[in-house]
Amino acid sequence: MRHQLVDGVTVLGNLAIDVINGAPQSPGGCASFAAVALTSADVPARIVAMGAPDDHALFDPLLERFGSLLRILPSDRTSSFRLDYVDVDHRRMSVDAVGPVWGSAEIEAANPDTTWLHLAPLLRTDFPADTLAQLAERGHRIVYDGQGLVRADRVGPLVVDRHFSQDLLPPLAVLKLAEDEAVIVADGTFDETTAKRLGVPEILVTFGSEGCDIYTEGSVVRIPAAWRVDGVQTTGAGDMFTACYALNRSAGVGPERAVELASELVASELEKRPRSEPVGRA
Protein backbone atom coordinates (compact mmCIF):
# COMPACT_ATOMS: atom_id res chain seq x y z
CA MET A 1 0.00 0.00 0.00
CA ARG A 2 1.33 3.43 -0.93
CA HIS A 3 1.78 5.85 1.96
CA GLN A 4 1.39 9.62 2.02
CA LEU A 5 4.98 10.80 1.64
CA VAL A 6 6.72 14.17 1.78
CA ASP A 7 9.69 15.28 -0.30
CA GLY A 8 12.86 14.52 1.64
CA VAL A 9 15.17 11.68 2.64
CA THR A 10 15.32 9.15 5.46
CA VAL A 11 18.45 7.09 6.15
CA LEU A 12 17.89 3.59 7.53
CA GLY A 13 20.74 1.40 8.73
CA ASN A 14 22.38 -0.46 11.57
CA LEU A 15 24.68 1.13 14.09
CA ALA A 16 28.15 -0.39 14.23
CA ILE A 17 30.91 -0.59 16.79
CA ASP A 18 34.16 0.11 14.94
CA VAL A 19 37.72 -0.57 16.03
CA ILE A 20 39.96 1.35 13.62
CA ASN A 21 43.70 0.67 13.53
CA GLY A 22 43.53 -0.83 17.02
CA ALA A 23 42.09 2.32 18.62
CA PRO A 24 39.31 2.22 21.24
CA GLN A 25 35.77 1.46 20.08
CA SER A 26 34.15 4.25 18.08
CA PRO A 27 30.66 4.83 16.65
CA GLY A 28 30.23 3.37 13.18
CA GLY A 29 27.57 2.54 10.66
CA CYS A 30 25.98 5.00 8.30
CA ALA A 31 24.08 6.74 11.10
CA SER A 32 27.38 7.83 12.60
CA PHE A 33 28.52 9.60 9.44
CA ALA A 34 25.48 10.50 7.32
CA ALA A 35 24.11 13.12 9.70
CA VAL A 36 26.69 15.72 8.66
CA ALA A 37 25.21 15.54 5.16
CA LEU A 38 21.70 16.22 6.42
CA THR A 39 22.17 18.97 9.00
CA SER A 40 21.65 21.83 6.55
CA ALA A 41 18.85 20.17 4.59
CA ASP A 42 16.15 22.37 3.09
CA VAL A 43 13.83 19.35 2.92
CA PRO A 44 12.76 16.92 5.68
CA ALA A 45 15.64 14.62 6.59
CA ARG A 46 16.24 12.14 9.38
CA ILE A 47 18.14 9.00 10.29
CA VAL A 48 16.75 5.88 11.95
CA ALA A 49 19.30 3.33 13.16
CA MET A 50 19.25 0.10 15.17
CA GLY A 51 21.52 -1.27 17.86
CA ALA A 52 21.41 -3.14 21.16
CA PRO A 53 20.43 -0.96 24.15
CA ASP A 54 23.58 -1.97 26.04
CA ASP A 55 25.64 -0.32 23.29
CA HIS A 56 23.64 2.90 22.95
CA ALA A 57 25.94 4.85 25.28
CA LEU A 58 28.68 4.75 22.64
CA PHE A 59 26.37 6.72 20.36
CA ASP A 60 25.21 9.30 22.93
CA PRO A 61 27.56 11.97 21.52
CA LEU A 62 25.81 11.62 18.16
CA LEU A 63 22.41 12.09 19.78
CA GLU A 64 23.71 15.13 21.64
CA ARG A 65 25.16 16.62 18.46
CA PHE A 66 22.34 15.90 16.03
CA GLY A 67 19.30 15.79 18.31
CA SER A 68 16.02 14.91 16.64
CA LEU A 69 17.76 14.24 13.32
CA LEU A 70 18.82 10.84 14.69
CA ARG A 71 16.54 8.21 16.21
CA ILE A 72 17.86 4.90 17.56
CA LEU A 73 15.67 1.81 17.74
CA PRO A 74 16.48 -1.11 20.07
CA SER A 75 17.59 -4.46 18.67
CA ASP A 76 18.95 -7.71 20.05
CA ARG A 77 22.52 -7.06 18.87
CA THR A 78 24.83 -4.47 17.32
CA SER A 79 27.03 -4.81 14.26
CA SER A 80 30.76 -4.71 15.00
CA PHE A 81 33.82 -4.41 12.75
CA ARG A 82 37.60 -4.11 12.86
CA LEU A 83 39.29 -1.96 10.22
CA ASP A 84 43.03 -1.69 9.64
CA TYR A 85 44.15 0.79 7.01
CA VAL A 86 47.18 -0.11 4.92
CA ASP A 87 47.38 2.98 2.69
CA VAL A 88 45.15 5.53 1.01
CA ASP A 89 43.45 2.91 -1.14
CA HIS A 90 43.49 -0.30 0.91
CA ARG A 91 42.29 -1.64 4.24
CA ARG A 92 41.79 -4.98 5.95
CA MET A 93 38.39 -5.55 7.52
CA SER A 94 36.85 -8.19 9.74
CA VAL A 95 33.38 -8.77 11.15
CA ASP A 96 33.17 -9.14 14.93
CA ALA A 97 29.36 -9.28 15.10
CA VAL A 98 26.56 -9.53 12.52
CA GLY A 99 23.87 -6.91 13.13
CA PRO A 100 20.06 -7.09 13.22
CA VAL A 101 17.76 -7.61 10.24
CA TRP A 102 15.30 -4.96 9.07
CA GLY A 103 11.96 -6.72 8.55
CA SER A 104 8.36 -5.56 8.45
CA ALA A 105 8.21 -4.84 12.19
CA GLU A 106 11.35 -2.72 12.06
CA ILE A 107 10.08 -0.76 9.06
CA GLU A 108 6.80 -0.09 10.85
CA ALA A 109 8.73 1.08 13.93
CA ALA A 110 10.89 3.40 11.84
CA ASN A 111 7.85 4.56 9.83
CA PRO A 112 9.75 6.52 7.14
CA ASP A 113 7.55 9.17 5.53
CA THR A 114 9.88 10.70 2.92
CA THR A 115 9.89 10.16 -0.83
CA TRP A 116 13.53 9.07 -0.84
CA LEU A 117 15.22 6.45 1.35
CA HIS A 118 18.92 5.84 1.71
CA LEU A 119 19.34 2.22 2.82
CA ALA A 120 22.77 1.63 4.32
CA PRO A 121 23.34 -2.12 4.80
CA LEU A 122 26.60 -3.13 6.41
CA LEU A 123 26.16 -6.77 5.40
CA ARG A 124 23.97 -8.69 2.95
CA THR A 125 21.35 -9.72 5.50
CA ASP A 126 20.59 -6.23 6.86
CA PHE A 127 17.79 -5.54 4.35
CA PRO A 128 16.22 -8.66 2.80
CA ALA A 129 14.59 -8.51 -0.63
CA ASP A 130 11.11 -8.70 0.93
CA THR A 131 11.87 -5.57 2.94
CA LEU A 132 13.02 -3.69 -0.15
CA ALA A 133 9.85 -4.74 -1.97
CA GLN A 134 7.75 -3.54 0.98
CA LEU A 135 9.45 -0.14 0.93
CA ALA A 136 8.97 0.21 -2.82
CA GLU A 137 5.29 -0.66 -2.42
CA ARG A 138 5.00 2.18 0.10
CA GLY A 139 6.10 4.53 -2.70
CA HIS A 140 9.69 5.24 -1.62
CA ARG A 141 12.55 5.77 -4.06
CA ILE A 142 15.36 3.63 -2.68
CA VAL A 143 19.06 4.54 -2.78
CA TYR A 144 20.95 1.37 -1.85
CA ASP A 145 24.57 0.99 -0.77
CA GLY A 146 26.23 -1.85 -2.69
CA GLN A 147 27.86 -3.19 0.46
CA GLY A 148 24.57 -5.00 0.91
CA LEU A 149 25.12 -6.92 -2.31
CA VAL A 150 28.67 -8.15 -1.82
CA ARG A 151 29.38 -8.46 1.92
CA ALA A 152 28.64 -11.92 3.33
CA ASP A 153 27.05 -12.17 6.77
CA ARG A 154 29.68 -14.17 8.63
CA VAL A 155 32.02 -13.45 11.52
CA GLY A 156 35.73 -13.30 10.78
CA PRO A 157 37.72 -11.73 7.95
CA LEU A 158 35.28 -9.93 5.68
CA VAL A 159 34.11 -12.15 2.82
CA VAL A 160 32.91 -10.46 -0.36
CA ASP A 161 31.30 -12.28 -3.28
CA ARG A 162 28.57 -11.90 -5.90
CA HIS A 163 26.17 -14.47 -4.41
CA PHE A 164 23.41 -11.94 -3.74
CA SER A 165 19.74 -12.39 -4.54
CA GLN A 166 18.72 -10.77 -7.82
CA ASP A 167 15.44 -9.91 -6.08
CA LEU A 168 17.29 -7.11 -4.29
CA LEU A 169 17.60 -5.09 -7.50
CA PRO A 170 14.10 -4.38 -8.93
CA PRO A 171 12.93 -2.15 -6.02
CA LEU A 172 15.96 0.15 -6.32
CA ALA A 173 16.00 3.64 -7.84
CA VAL A 174 19.74 4.16 -7.24
CA LEU A 175 22.57 1.69 -6.58
CA LYS A 176 25.85 3.06 -5.23
CA LEU A 177 28.94 0.87 -5.62
CA ALA A 178 32.52 1.50 -4.56
CA GLU A 179 35.07 0.53 -7.20
CA ASP A 180 35.94 -2.81 -5.59
CA GLU A 181 32.26 -3.67 -5.12
CA ALA A 182 31.56 -2.89 -8.78
CA VAL A 183 34.27 -5.33 -9.89
CA ILE A 184 32.71 -8.07 -7.75
CA VAL A 185 29.18 -7.40 -8.99
CA ALA A 186 30.35 -7.37 -12.62
CA ASP A 187 32.72 -10.33 -12.15
CA GLY A 188 35.25 -8.17 -13.96
CA THR A 189 35.11 -4.74 -15.55
CA PHE A 190 31.96 -2.77 -14.74
CA ASP A 191 30.60 -1.12 -17.88
CA GLU A 192 27.37 -0.11 -19.63
CA THR A 193 26.54 -3.76 -20.33
CA THR A 194 26.77 -4.59 -16.63
CA ALA A 195 24.64 -1.59 -15.71
CA LYS A 196 21.98 -2.60 -18.23
CA ARG A 197 21.97 -6.17 -16.89
CA LEU A 198 21.42 -4.96 -13.31
CA GLY A 199 18.46 -2.87 -14.44
CA VAL A 200 18.71 -0.14 -11.78
CA PRO A 201 17.81 3.30 -13.26
CA GLU A 202 20.77 5.12 -11.67
CA ILE A 203 24.05 3.43 -10.76
CA LEU A 204 26.93 5.29 -9.13
CA VAL A 205 30.41 3.75 -9.14
CA THR A 206 32.79 5.71 -6.91
CA PHE A 207 36.58 5.78 -7.29
CA GLY A 208 37.59 7.75 -4.21
CA SER A 209 39.75 10.71 -5.19
CA GLU A 210 39.36 9.78 -8.88
CA GLY A 211 35.68 10.70 -8.99
CA CYS A 212 32.44 8.88 -9.76
CA ASP A 213 30.82 7.28 -12.81
CA ILE A 214 27.06 7.75 -13.27
CA TYR A 215 25.20 5.17 -15.33
CA THR A 216 21.77 6.30 -16.52
CA GLU A 217 19.68 5.31 -19.55
CA GLY A 218 22.47 3.37 -21.26
CA SER A 219 25.12 6.08 -20.91
CA VAL A 220 27.95 6.76 -18.48
CA VAL A 221 29.42 10.09 -17.32
CA ARG A 222 32.55 10.54 -15.18
CA ILE A 223 32.29 13.30 -12.56
CA PRO A 224 35.70 14.28 -11.13
CA ALA A 225 36.16 14.40 -7.38
CA ALA A 226 35.98 17.86 -5.82
CA TRP A 227 39.57 17.67 -4.59
CA ARG A 228 41.93 15.09 -3.10
CA VAL A 229 42.44 14.85 0.66
CA ASP A 230 45.49 12.82 1.69
CA GLY A 231 46.76 11.62 5.06
CA VAL A 232 43.44 10.87 6.77
CA GLN A 233 41.51 7.67 7.41
CA THR A 234 38.29 7.90 5.47
CA THR A 235 35.86 5.55 7.20
CA GLY A 236 32.34 6.79 6.53
CA ALA A 237 33.17 8.79 3.41
CA GLY A 238 30.89 6.60 1.34
CA ASP A 239 28.05 7.06 3.83
CA MET A 240 28.40 10.84 3.72
CA PHE A 241 28.58 10.78 -0.07
CA THR A 242 25.47 8.65 -0.54
CA ALA A 243 23.41 10.50 2.06
CA CYS A 244 24.26 13.84 0.46
CA TYR A 245 23.45 12.46 -2.99
CA ALA A 246 20.08 11.16 -1.83
CA LEU A 247 19.31 14.44 -0.09
CA ASN A 248 19.95 16.49 -3.20
CA ARG A 249 18.07 14.10 -5.45
CA SER A 250 15.10 14.40 -3.09
CA ALA A 251 15.29 18.18 -3.52
CA GLY A 252 15.04 17.88 -7.30
CA VAL A 253 18.75 18.15 -8.15
CA GLY A 254 19.90 16.08 -11.15
CA PRO A 255 22.33 13.15 -10.82
CA GLU A 256 25.46 14.95 -12.07
CA ARG A 257 25.09 17.99 -9.83
CA ALA A 258 24.10 15.77 -6.90
CA VAL A 259 27.38 13.87 -7.29
CA GLU A 260 29.34 17.13 -7.42
CA LEU A 261 27.71 18.38 -4.21
CA ALA A 262 28.28 15.05 -2.47
CA SER A 263 31.95 15.06 -3.47
CA GLU A 264 32.40 18.59 -2.15
CA LEU A 265 30.82 17.67 1.17
CA VAL A 266 33.03 14.60 1.62
CA ALA A 267 36.22 16.49 0.83
CA SER A 268 35.27 19.27 3.24
CA GLU A 269 34.55 16.79 6.04
CA LEU A 270 37.73 14.78 5.45
CA GLU A 271 39.80 17.95 5.71
CA LYS A 272 38.57 18.32 9.29
CA ARG A 273 40.11 14.97 10.31
CA PRO A 274 43.59 14.75 11.82
CA ARG A 275 46.43 13.69 9.56
CA SER A 276 47.83 10.33 10.54
CA GLU A 277 49.50 7.21 9.18
CA PRO A 278 48.55 4.71 7.97
CA VAL A 279 45.63 6.07 6.01
CA GLY A 280 42.90 4.49 3.96
CA ARG A 281 39.84 4.86 1.76
CA ALA A 282 36.22 4.18 2.70
Segments predicted by a language model, with ranges:
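Conserved N-terminal subdomain of the carbohydrate kinase-like
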Residues: 2-8, 16-25, 40-121, 125, ...
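Conserved phosphate-binding/catalytic region of the ribokinase-like
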Residues: 2-5, 159, 163-166, 189-282
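Active-site metal-binding loops of divalent metal-dependent hydrolases
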Residues: 13-15, 240
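Conserved alpha-helical elements of sugar-nucleotide-dependent glycosyltransferases
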Residues: 26-30
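Alpha-helix C-terminal capping segments
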Residues: 35-44, 248-251
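Short beta-strand scaffold segments in enzyme catalytic cores
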Residues: 36, 81-83, 211-215
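Generic beta-sheet signal
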Residues: 48-50, 145, 206
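Conserved beta-alpha-beta core of the PfkB/ribokinase-like small-molecule kinase fold
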Residues: 116, 120-193, 211
